[in-house]
Amino acid sequence: GEAGALTVTLLVGVGKTATHEVVITRPGRPHEGEARPARIALVLQGDDADLATVHDIDAPFAVAAPATGDGHERFLRDLHHAGHEIVLMVPMEPENYPRVNPGPGTLLVSMSEGRIRGELTRMVREGEGVVAVANLLGSFATQDESFVTSVYRTLKGLGLPFLHLTPAPRAVCKPLASRMGVAYDEPDVALVDEARAKTTEPLEAAWTTAIAHAHKHGAAIVLVRVTPLSAPWLPSAVKAASAAGVTLVPLSGVIHHASPL
């Protein structure tokens, strides 16, 4: 068949009478050099004031939004009603807590498994349109296997993946996800420091890297921090991706998925 596709038809029956037909197919492989579809899933990180400065993006994008804090329920509801997928940023214990504090409702390593799972489940259920859970800080908590196990058991039960933002060097999240069968991803490209630069040149360079990654691997998850610099730059970035043959798609079409228990 085309590109080496193979189809085998088996006739099953009694004697010379066929009662069933089984068709087994193996899709062909792309020809050498054949272009694969390139996709970018754009995730914007910011609060409601930040997102209000984003205009004229003619493409889907997800929003990494905090799970707690003043007005978070309204913000999550507004995002969902606007058609945006949500990456729920759950505050987790960082190093040097409480001097460094991600905010109210922070999940702590000292909490029992029951409390961690209960609080996390409540946070997820408060928001509609949640397609993944991410860490808000959490450099200390993500190094603790018992803590991460509690989080992963909850996410596996909810059928949600974990999107790990800025992993700490000693974080156990990635290897533990593999052992527990939990869907795990990290942004392929994160435009955070670049979004705080003095000019858009670092943003342009990182976006070029994201486009190249999408072409090479078929897809890229790209996180962009919304700032006064990055917000007005985003529409031109989306147009540049389209001109380069990259389609922006919803995050749910790119991120790995977990199966509910």
Regions found by a protein language model. Give the residues of each.
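Terminal interaction modules at protein C-ends
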Residues: 1-37
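Active-site beta->alpha N-cap acidic-glycine motif
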Residues: 25-104
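Hydrophobic faces of well-ordered beta-strands that scaffold small-molecule active sites
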Residues: 40-44, 61-65, 84-90, 131-135, ...
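Catalytic beta/alpha-barrel core
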Residues: 43-44, 62-68, 110-116, 131-144, ...
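Solvent-exposed loop/turn segments at secondary-structure junctions
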Residues: 47-49, 69-71, 92-96, 138-142, ...
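Alpha-helical scaffold elements lining the catalytic groove of polysaccharide deacetylases
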Residues: 101-125, 142-147, 174-215
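Active-site groove signature of glycoside hydrolases
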Residues: 121-140, 216-217, 223
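C-terminal domain-boundary segment and adjacent tail
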Residues: 155-169, 174, 226-261
